[in-house]
Amino acid sequence: MRHRTIVCPLIENKGHYLLCKMAADRGVFPGQWALSGGVEPGERIEEALRREIREELGEKLILTHIAPWCFRDDTRVKTYPDGHQETIYMIYLIFNCVSANRDVTINEEFDDYAWVKAEDLKNYDLNAATRVTLSLKGLL
C-alpha cells in the first residue's frame, strides 16, 4: 500500500475558514470541499506547508501564524479516470494558521474556494478527511 503524507493548513481569517473545492477529475476526493496540502520527497514539514500554500493558494495570501495542531491517519481509496482504484495510507499533519488577508488565487487542483463561517461549514460537501478534521477542532 502506498503511503502519502499530507500537510493540512486549517486557515482562519476573522472567524472564517478557507475551504477549497477539489477539481472534479483530480485527487482522492474529486469535486468535494477540502483543505490543501502534500509533502514531496526530501521536504521538511513546514517547508512543505508553505510551498503547498504558495502553489495551491497563491503568493498573496499572508499567514501571520502557523502552529502544529494535531496529526492523524486513515486509509482512502483513490479512483483513477480509467476506473482503476488504489488504497492509500494517509498521514495528516494539521496546522492552525491565521491569515492577514483573504487574497487567494487557486491553481488547477481546485475548481473554487470559499471563506466560510464556522456555523456554515456543515452546509458544504466536505470530504471525509476534512469532516473529521473540522469535527476534531469542534467546528462541526
UniProtKB/Swiss-Prot annotation:
Domain Nudix hydrolase: 1-140
Assembly and binders: Monomer.
Alphabetically ordered keywords of this record: Hydrolase, Magnesium
Xref: HAMAP family: Nudix_NudI
Protein name according to UniProt: Nucleoside triphosphatase NudI
Organism of provenance: Klebsiella pneumoniae subsp. pneumoniae (strain ATCC 700721 / MGH 78578)
Cofactor(s), by name: Mg(2+)
Keyword Transit peptide recorded: no
InterPro entries in the cross-refs: Nucleoside_triphosphatase_NudI, NUDIX_hydrolase-like_dom_sf, NUDIX_hydrolase_CS, NUDIX_hydrolase_dom
Motif (Nudix box): 38-58
Assigned EC number: 3.6.1.9, 3.6.1.12, 3.6.1.-, 3.6.1.23
GO terms of molecular function: dCTP diphosphatase activity; dTTP diphosphatase activity; dUTP diphosphatase activity; magnesium ion binding
Bridged cysteine pairs (disulfide): none
Catalytic activity, as annotated: a ribonucleoside 5'-triphosphate + H2O = a ribonucleoside 5'-phosphate + diphosphate + H(+); a 2'-deoxyribonucleoside 5'-triphosphate + H2O = a 2'-deoxyribonucleoside 5'-phosphate + diphosphate + H(+); dUTP + H2O = dUMP + diphosphate + H(+); dTTP + H2O = dTMP + diphosphate + H(+)
Functional summary from the UniProt entry: Catalyzes the hydrolysis of nucleoside triphosphates, with a preference for pyrimidine deoxynucleoside triphosphates (dUTP, dTTP and dCTP).
Family of this protein: Belongs to the Nudix hydrolase family. NudI subfamily.
